[in-house]
Amino acid sequence: MQLQRLGAPLLKRLVGGCIRQSTAPIMPCVVVSGSGVFLTPVRTYMPLPNDQSDFSPYIEIDLPSESRIQSLHKSGLAAQEWVACEKVHGTNFGIYLINQGDHEVVRFAKRSGIMDPNENFFGYHILIDEFTAQIRILNDLLKQKYGLSRVGRLVLNGELFGAKYKHPLVPKSEKWCTLPNGKKFPIAGVQIQREPFPQYSPELHFFAFDIKYSVSGAEEDFVLLGYDEFVEFSSKVPNLLYARALVRGTLDECLAFDVENFMTPLPALLGLGNYPLEGNLAEGVVIRHVRRGDPAVEKHNVSTIIKLRCSSFMELKHPGKQKELKETFIDTVRSGALRRVRGNVTVISDSMLPQVEAAANDLLLNNVSDGRLSNVLSKIGREPLLSGEVSQVDVVLMLAKDALKDFLKEVDSLVLNTTLAFRKLLITNVYFESKRLVEQKWKELMQEEAAAQSEAIPPLSPAAPTKGE
């Protein structure tokens, strides 16, 4: 928008109008120069509904400070099951189903409150029909599962994201968002994020990560579904994209995830696997206790959900924070977690991979077996192993290469046509799976080889008696 030169009376009326229409404490910026008075363009929002009693705020997720991690270890929760899911870079968004006695109303919320139906919030109206069907299906599933006659309030929280994918072979969205008042906006003009990465799709999407419900409708009666229940319900809702575990294990195993080199798998899930973007790092991950929300877990009064961001993203989002992140997380929290898991960086599960890639990943890892390890060792021979000529690292590499070689012989051509990024991921995964197996078996193998060698050496013949004996 070009700046407009304004006379004083018109300026006063416009500034006053902006203040009256917006509940956000944002004032238009007035610039005075020698050539006149200018009003800078400021985004103003439609007023929120006066009654926000149905709004249920989403919590701010904590960063993994050293003190928080220590508290989790002291409470005993750190040794229990946690999951790490991708942290999608978008804007917080909630889908509400509110029981008003004789009927149910669907409403939509941003982080600060339920929105006026005519607020243009990043083009979400284009997805309203899908959202409405999904929240109603979810409501029916909940009532059926728990034997409920009604649900007072149901909230599906997630992230609105997308509308940006700068690849020369991927066209911009041609869709338009139409508000109830008739105003129209192109999805291609939506800008949820300004950072160059991560990018997901030229179309607008929703990524669900939490479900909570209140039978009475009262805020104090809300029940937050644990992760496994969340997945159970989300998987039954048609076309719902939801948070799936990249890693499942102890808190340390989740913290050991290599967030610094994690490329977002979402474009592939959204059909853009053949059009990867170089350096398309994920923002990070969210790590949560699988029973977050359970009173038995929450009674410890410690954080049961934390977020990790890669330092490259932090530098873009908050310039100058990269050093702080390194000092407060990479050199402390994550290094401590890596020590406790003995340096094993957890391999990404196939839950966030499309069907073909997931099947290929399973097939490849199945090739890393005890039988294959025995075959590799037989090719090496006993002496090089016992003398140290062939090291444990050498065996890992030989096992990984052998598994990969046979995998390529039997795999479908579809897999050979997957993205370069996925093929690199396969190589990484087969290496770490080989490393895990060799480390698990190494001590036992070396003892067996040593015992076999001692049995193979014939006993020394008794010395011949010397003359005079």
UniProtKB/Swiss-Prot annotation:
One of its GO terms (cellular component) is mitochondrial mRNA editing complex. ATP binds at residues 59-61, 86-92, 111, 159, 209, 307-309. It comes from the Eukaryota. It catalyses: ATP + (ribonucleotide)n-3'-hydroxyl + 5'-phospho-(ribonucleotide)m = (ribonucleotide)n+m + AMP + diphosphate. It comes from Trypanosoma brucei brucei. Coiled coil: none annotated. SUPFAM superfamilies: DNA ligase/mRNA capping enzyme, catalytic domain. InterPro entries: RNA_lig_RNL2, RNA_ligase_dom_REL/Rnl2, Rnl1/2_C_sf. Belongs to the RNA ligase 2 family. Component of the RNA editing complex (editosome), a 1600 kDa complex composed of at least 20 proteins. Interacts with terminal uridylyltransferase MEAT1. This is RNA-editing ligase 1, mitochondrial. The active site is at 87 (n6-amp-lysine intermediate). GO terms for molecular function: ATP binding; RNA binding; RNA ligase (ATP) activity. GO terms for biological process: mRNA processing; RNA modification. NCBIfam families: RNA_lig_RNL2. Its main location: mitochondrion. It is found in: Mitochondrion. Residues 450-469 are annotated as: Disordered. Its EC number is 6.5.1.3. The gene is REL1. Residues 1-44 form a transit peptide. Essential for RNA editing. RNA editing in kinetoplastid mitochondria inserts and deletes uridylates at multiple sites in pre-mRNAs as directed by guide RNAs. Keywords: ATP-binding, Ligase, Mitochondrion, mRNA processing, Nucleotide-binding, RNA-binding, Transit peptide.
